[in-house]
Regions:
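A short, structured loop/turn motif at beta-sheet edges
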Residues: 2-8, 36-39
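Short N-terminal binding/cap micro-motifs at the start of the first secondary-structure element
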Residues: 18-23
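Short, charged beta-turn/beta-strand-edge "cap" motif at the junction between a beta-strand
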Residues: 17, 47-53
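A short beta-strand micro-motif
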Residues: 8-15
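Short, flexible N-terminal segments of the mature chain
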Residues: 24-49
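Short, conserved turn/kink motifs that form compact alpha/beta structural patches or helix kinks used as
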Residues: 40, 51-70
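Short, compact, well-ordered microdomains
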Residues: 63-106
């Protein structure tokens, strides 16, 4: 039986967006940018557990990719759309105030 060691996964917030026109049409009046994450914020995961302070909805989206990276596997077939197999760029599913994350295997 082979035991596979997990790499640490660094999760960096690249951008936080807020689409005012969509918020005005579809959201409550006091909605603003994501309250969980700020540009430049860095979090770490073992690829299995969400880091402290991570938005649960965003984690549900990026967890499969974090797991792959923690196991040393690429998140996409080599050269498909990213130029480095050890990284991934993903967004949370909030269409009004999405957050863009960079995941890196360490």
């Amino acid at each position: 039986m082979t035991i596979q060691m997990h790499k640490k996964v660094k999760i960096t917030v690249l951008r936080t967006e807020y689409y005012q026109e969509l918020a005005e049409q579809y959201a409550i009046s006091y909605l603003g940018k994501c309250p969980f994450h700020q540009k430049g914020q860095v979090l770490y995961s073992d690829g299995i557990n969400p880091p402290d302070g991570m938005c649960g909805v965003a984690w549900q989206v990026i967890a499969p990719m974090a797991r792959q990276l923690s196991l040393g596997e690429p998140v996409q077939p080599s050269g498909t759309w990213l130029n480095d197999d050890r990284v991934g760029v993903f967004a949370c599913p909030d269409g009004i105030r999405p957050v863009i994350f960079l995941l890196e295997a360490e």
